[in-house]
Amino acid sequence: MDQKIIQLSNNVQVANDKPFVLFGGMNVLESRDLAMSIAEHYVEVTQKLGIPYVFKASFDKANRSSVNSYRGPGMEEGLRIFEEIKSTFNVPMITDVHEIHQCAPVAEVVDIIQLPAFLARQTDLVVAMAKTGAVINVKKPQFLAPHEMRHIITKFNEAGNDNIILCERGSSFGYNNLVVDMLGMDEMKQTGYPVIFDATHALQRPGGRADSAGGRRAQATELARSGMALGLAGLFIEAHPDPDNAKCDGPCALPLHLLEKYLTQMKAVDELVKSFEFIDTSK
């Protein structure tokens, strides 16, 4: 099957048969200074390792477990920070939207707008995102089977947008738990669209800490290596210099100081797997 190539700025290409792209950053913008510092570290490490890179952060976490949880600085301030990061480091950027009115202004600043998993079946939001003409990253809902992603793809296509990336972030497995279906990611690859793996959110234990999500940070490397062995278009991760005190999803975040060691392993797995000849076992 032909593999679709998504072309971003800086000659970054996202495709299942290309070297993997890192979609990395922080969960939510906590401050301008912290965002700049984290972005700088990612840029230094990815340039050293020769890994194509897209910066990620959220300006609003609209689906927190508790009404009292930190959500972020909001769209206006968030876009100002994104513009500064983009102009300073000259990297493509991705962030998520939650409401129709956010789509157009966000698409003017970032390269990729992300459809959150919980909202992936909201047709009006899908259409508004599609009409921006931006590249779209679709988070697979925890409650959908991999083959059902074709319906979401069709919605974007019918609205005039074919620049789609699919992202696996785990599937619900009973209460307060997620599992990753490796064969499901391969099934999504059969669409021809690039598939990336959100290896940090897949470590979540939703609602695992009563009023916020828990996580399994200690298994971050094992899960990511397993996903990369499928030969994916990209890896999606979030890191923090002090995960235990991060304002959102700290239990899933990779400690920032481990980024280089972590990515060195992921690149090695990606290069090895993509050096293999494809074996068609269906015949």
From Swiss-Prot:
Pfam family, one: DAHP_synth_1
Organism per entry: Shewanella frigidimarina (strain NCIMB 400)
Record flagged with keyword Transferase: yes
Keyword hit for NAD: no
Enzyme Commission code(s) on record: 2.5.1.55
Keywords: Cytoplasm, Lipopolysaccharide biosynthesis, Transferase
Gene Ontology CC terms: cytoplasm
Name this protein carries in UniProt: 2-dehydro-3-deoxyphosphooctonate aldolase
GO biological process: keto-3-deoxy-D-manno-octulosonic acid biosynthetic process
Protein family (similarity comment): Belongs to the KdsA family.
Principal place of residence: cytoplasm
Reactions catalysed: D-arabinose 5-phosphate + phosphoenolpyruvate + H2O = 3-deoxy-alpha-D-manno-2-octulosonate-8-phosphate + phosphate
GO molecular function: 3-deoxy-8-phosphooctulonate synthase activity
InterPro entries linked: Aldolase_TIM, DAHP1/KDSA, KDO8P_synthase
Compartments, as annotated in UniProt: Cytoplasm
Listed pathway(s): Carbohydrate biosynthesis; 3-deoxy-D-manno-octulosonate biosynthesis; 3-deoxy-D-manno-octulosonate from D-ribulose 5-phosphate: step 2/3; Bacterial outer membrane biogenesis; lipopolysaccharide biosynthesis
Coiled coil ranges: none
